[in-house]
UniProtKB/Swiss-Prot annotation:
Keyword line: Aminotransferase, Transferase
Swiss-Prot/TrEMBL catalytic activity: N(6)-[(R)-S(8)-aminomethyldihydrolipoyl]-L-lysyl-[protein] + (6S)-5,6,7,8-tetrahydrofolate = N(6)-[(R)-dihydrolipoyl]-L-lysyl-[protein] + (6R)-5,10-methylene-5,6,7,8-tetrahydrofolate + NH4(+)
Quaternary structure (record): The glycine cleavage system is composed of four proteins: P, T, L and H.
Functional summary from the UniProt entry: The glycine cleavage system catalyzes the degradation of glycine.
UniProt record, GO biological process: glycine decarboxylation via glycine cleavage system
Protein name: Aminomethyltransferase
UniProt keyword Disulfide bond, yes or no: no
GO molecular-function terms, A-Z: aminomethyltransferase activity; transaminase activity
Gene symbol of the encoding locus: gcvT
Superkingdom as given in the UniProt entry: Bacteria
Amino acid sequence: MTNKTVLHAKHLASGAKMVDFFGWDMPINYGSQIEEHHAVRTDAGMFDVSHMTIVDVQGADAKAFLRRLVINDVAKLATPGKALYTGMLNEEGGVIDDLIIYFFSDTDYRLVVNSATRVKDLAWMTKQSTGFDITITERPEFGMLAVQGPEAKAKVAKLLTAEQIEAVEGMKPFFGVQVGDLFIATTGYTGEDGYEIIVPNNSAEDFWQKLLDEGVVPCGLGARDTLRLEAGMNLYGLDMDETVSPLAANMAWTISWEPTDRDFIGRDVLTAQKAAGDQPKLVGLVLEAKGVLRSHQVVVTEFGNGEITSGTFSPTLGHSVALARVPRSVKVGDTIEVEMRKKLIKVQVTKPSFVRNGKKVF
């Protein structure tokens, strides 16, 4: 039985091509993935992300529990609504999932985790909650939309009440606010400005339709993938999984090593890996010649082989880009090779980010 989001009928009405995405019937595109991609880079596009898992963690020990559960430190979060990106690790230091945590108070947090990892995430959190005075509550009564692009905020504002407009006015990145029926957050997965909006299921279709009426372009999973890859954002299951350390997945910046007495799950393993300095790293690859870089292609370097984790043709740049896990000695600016159709093709090593706010950043 395939799951359907609350917006499923809207996708069909817009002529979406639907695919099975980890048990969810989701739109891959509405006709042209490239046009949808460009809409987000130049104007405004919207995505149904209601398949994502929303989990509220509440109770006297909520803060202590999350300080143990994830590699970033929720103690940093002092302003209600502030959010952070982090990873949840197993005891071996592998990434169970990446997620966003919103802080409401020391006893009230909201987590947004991936849909493909929902069952194992909830099981892991429940297992780790033993001894903590908390409740873990999934929130399936909400849908979620991402409205992204340089004109996204202005177009969303046309749908908001005066109170909601005032609440989000000047809101910095990685903040969220509950105002009226909507939870509006300045987060996203595209490298563009915009909002992710959590909306009650019973008003999700109406909200989607009003955005359509404002000229916001519906976008599918195809454009979502090319946009996130241009922005250098990881996709769980490709760029990292339970066998991969955050140190090897461009997630080291999300690890809060201080204070040293915070015993987060996987800390001992990461500390040893950091000291050894032998973890591979995630870099960007650029191929300006013909050809498309793809996941699992072998990367050949003088320090040993690596592997492309995510690769695609970049509609914004007009050539192929990829994320690849390579030996740590490989440096930005190096020329290395990728095996393509039994040939070795030269590629340039860059930082793992290619486009932000519509502009090339490498």
